[in-house]
Regions:
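N-terminal accessory segment detector
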Residues: 1-488, 492-517
Length: 517
């Protein structure tokens, strides 16, 4: 019998939480799912699978998506819409590492793949890794076939559409107002529309404009709806020469000369069929669904493999590189002070600022050290911390505080390491080809230390300064190693926040509050 499994306390309320004893909260939920499968505790295994998919992974994941969405909005509000798209382009080039050059007059070059096959390849990654479609991707998506095209229907797009609608799983409202209000003037990179959030603009830029700049053709047309409750679509034409001129005009480009001899069908709006992604083959079935079916069928070996597959899929999205690229851009162009203001303008689920009408919390409102450690452990597990990204943390219960060790941290720390996961192989992101940097001078945004990886400033501002802003106290203290290449951080949760040494306030430019009785 698994002692760690017996300690699991899964609370299923409006939000699902693991309220395990303090000595168990660092254990990977994926390990616990495996324990439950091996012991035949199938209901618990499926409950833990739902929890890790819908709640645990979303904690850091959605915050990282919101962070990506926040950078262009910050630049637009403070430096204008042309600066926003200039920085978007630079971030896309660094994130994607294109091999082909961009040019105003590219050599017109059709892909060897059909538009449908090309979009299908991308769509599979969007479903599995990006969680596009209904119910956070667990409900799949549909493809509508018309005589001249296929429309991939994302209802919603997880990264852009979810923030526009709000999140039905977590119950959070739309992010659009007042945070992500979008452009005020129509541009080619907003499909000629206004009010397009900065995150959504990257689809116009990367999937439309930049593709035309490389090959002369659109890979697909992006269907961005004005109404957030209507789905986004990838419109893949059966022949790229059939793509209407309007899709080029709206992005400020000219349609290439038609070379196809195939006549475009006339009744193009006649729906031929609707295909659900589950019908495309077993590889298209959401992994959560596959896992539950294997558990119900008693196929333990298969289920155990699917658990590893699900954990692996949660890490196959480039949010670390994307966010780090944006941070490097802001530091280089605008400086560390502006990085601070950018981070403070983007809410973080770990330490949300008080709502305007909410009374300022007091020391008495601060959760106890164990509860804060549970939240920290949730972040660490969600952020894929631990050896081999196993989504675990180490918890040490000390007399005056609870210590959480990230060995390594799943984001900034893992970025400093060589990764050999098949399909994701890379060296440290501080080396080629990214060459991300560390702080050259001491600054409060990075604990007044030199040599801190720039990405780590995110934890300093969101976790430490965020809690200070909310409570007037540091409720989480983070100790970043002095060695810039060391990926292992420690978080401290003091039992009495008055016992936090003053140096932890001083290093972020704050003053320690007077001790309260």
């Amino acid at each position: 019998m698994s002692k760690r499994l017996d300690k699991v306390k899964l609370v299923k309320g409006r939000q699902w939480e693991r309220q395990d004893p303090i000595d168990n909260i660092g254990v990977s939920t994926y390990v616990l799912i495996k324990d439950a499968i091996q012991e035949g505790r199938n209901d618990l295994a499926k409950d833990l699978a739902d929890y890790v998919y819908f709640w645990e992974t979303k904690f850091a994941r959605d915050t990282n998506f919101d962070l990506i969405a926040g950078w262009p909005e910050f630049v637009r509000i403070n430096y204008g819409e042309y600066a926003e798209i200039e920085d978007q382009r630079a971030a896309m080039i660094q994130t994607r590492m294109w091999k082909l050059p961009f040019t105003e007059k590219p050599t017109v070059q059709k892909r060897e793949q059909s538009p449908y096959d090309y979009t299908m390849g991308y769509g599979w990654r969007m479903l599995k890794y990006h969680r596009m479609g209904k119910n956070d991707g667990a409900g799949g998506f549909t493809i509508e076939e018309y005589p001249d095209r296929y429309e991939f229907v994302w209802d919603p797009c997880y990264s852009g559409g979810r923030p526009r609608r709000g999140d039905p799983v977590t119950g959070t409202p739309p992010r659009t107002s007042p945070l992500y209000t979008g452009n005020q003037v129509p541009h080619p990179w907003s499909w000629g529309k206004t009010g397009v959030p900065g995150y959504c603009m990257h689809c116009a830029l990367i999937h439309n404009i930049m593709d035309v700049e490389q090959r002369g053709y659109l890979q697909w047309a992006s269907g961005y709806p004005d109404d957030p409750w209507k789905p986004c679509t990838y419109i893949a034409y059966k022949d790229v020469d059939w793509i209407p001129e309007e899709y080029y005009t709206r992005i400020g480009r000219t349609k290439p000369k038609v070379t196809s001899t195939a006549p475009r069908p006339k009744d193009v709006n006649k729906l031929i069929r609707v295909i659900h992604s589950d019908e495309l083959g077993p590889e298209w079935v959401p992994t959560l669904t596959m896992l539950k079916k294997a558990i119900d069928a008693g196929k333990k070996k298969e289920a155990l493999k699917i658990v590893d597959q699900m954990r692996d899929e949660m890490g196959r999205i480039s949010m670390l590189i994307w966010n780090w690229s944006w941070m490097e851009l802001i530091i280089e162009k605008y400086g560390y002070n502006e990085l601070y203001h950018a981070l403070r303008s983007i809410p973080c689920s770990y330490a949300l600022p008080p709502a305007p009408e909410e009374p300022r919390p007091t020391k008495a409102d601060i959760p106890n050290a164990e509860e804060r450690a549970r939240r920290g452990a949730l972040w660490g597990r969600s952020d894929r911390s631990g050896p081999n990204a196993d989504c675990s943390v180490n918890i040490i219960d000390e007399p005056d505080r609870v210590v959480m060790e990230l060995a390594p941290c799943g984001s900034g720390g893992r970025g400093l390491m060589t990764i050999d996961t098949p399909g994701m192989e890379r060296g440290p992101v501080t080396g080629n080809p990214w060459n991300f940097k560390t702080t050259p001078v001491a600054h409060p945004v990075a604990w007044n230390k030199v040599g801190v990886p720039n990405y780590c400033a995110r934890c300093c501002v969101h976790m430490e300064m965020g809690s200070l802003s909310r409570y007037g106290y540091l409720t989480t203290v983070i100790e970043r190693p002095e060695n810039a290449t060391d990926p292992n951080c420690r978080w401290f949760f003091y039992r009495d926040v008055d016992d936090i040494p003053e140096k932890y306030y001083t290093r972020i430019g704050a003053k320690k509050p007077a001790r309260q009785k």
